[in-house]
């Protein structure tokens, strides 16, 4: 892709000043991904893996000096779904990302981040269904700083009879209400803020006719 402007960045009094300069600039990018899954009869389940790689590059001006840079992201996402017993079903998913920023004349800067989710369903009898869900988020901010977030939910369903059913759900058991962090890679900075619904308990009943 041929663009008619180049990004530029200057450091002025410890502030990053971004602007555009009228010039020709080439932007290149490509993406590769693959997915595979396999049934595992011994565990009455399935395992899968998705892998993706994205690479993009262009040129920018750092303090009025042209510099080429590349940004790459490797994504690895395994998943598992097993039934260890007739009354236990477990699902686990992980998405891991490694992002690298490479600028000519500088050491590459790499960051890790991932999120994972575990869901366990218990069916001790035909009348009861219990579910637990846990989520973990991790973001690397710098070489020695990182951010974590852990969430958990639980639910219970009781089939009273052929028509009546009662449910109870407890969401955000740890009471986390926000998740915020800022990243800086020497070229740009980004601030991320997520609002989380406060801890709550919901009770319900339904009737089939």
List each model region and its residues.
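C-terminal beta-signal and adjacent terminal beta-strands/loops
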Residues: 138, 158-209
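Transmembrane beta-strands of outer-membrane beta-barrel pores
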Residues: 9, 51-59, 94-102, 134-140, ...
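Residues that define the transmembrane beta-barrel architecture of outer-membrane proteins
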Residues: 26-32, 68-74, 108-114, 148-152, ...
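Repeated loop/turn-to-beta-strand initiation elements of outer-membrane beta-barrel proteins
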Residues: 40-47, 86-91, 126-132, 162-168, ...
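C-terminal beta-barrel architecture of Gram-negative outer-membrane proteins
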Residues: 90-159
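Membrane-embedded beta-strand positions of outer-membrane beta-barrel proteins
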Residues: 6, 47-51, 78, 90-94, ...
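Residues on the lipid-exposed face of transmembrane beta-strands in outer-membrane beta-barrel proteins
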Residues: 32-38, 76-84, 116-122, 154-158, ...
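Single conserved hydrophobic/aromatic residue that forms the stacking wall/gate
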Residues: 1-8, 12
């Amino acid at each position: 892709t041929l663009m008619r402007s180049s990004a530029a960045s200057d450091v002025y009094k410890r502030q990053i000043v971004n602007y555009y300069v009228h010039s020709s600039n080439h932007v290149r990018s490509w993406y590769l991904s693959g997915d595979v899954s396999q049934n595992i009869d011994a565990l009455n389940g399935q395992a899968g893996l998705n892998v993706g790689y994205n690479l993009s590059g262009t040129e920018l001006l750092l303090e009025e000096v042209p510099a080429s840079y590349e940004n790459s992201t490797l994504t690895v996402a395994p998943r598992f779904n097993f039934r260890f017993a007739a009354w236990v079903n477990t699902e686990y998913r992980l998405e891991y990302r490694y992002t690298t920023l490479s600028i000519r004349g500088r050491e590459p800067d790499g960051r890790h981040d991932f999120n994972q989710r575990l869901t366990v369903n218990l069916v001790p009898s035909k009348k009861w269904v219990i579910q637990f869900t846990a989520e973990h988020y991790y973001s690397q901010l710098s070489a020695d700083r990182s951010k974590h977030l852990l969430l958990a939910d639980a639910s219970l369903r009781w089939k009273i009879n052929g028509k009546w059913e009662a449910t109870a759900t407890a969401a955000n058991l740890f009471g986390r209400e926000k998740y915020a962090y800022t990243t800086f890679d020497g070229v740009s900075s980004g601030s991320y803020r997520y609002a989380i619904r406060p801890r709550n308990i919901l009770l319900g009943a339904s009737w089939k006719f």
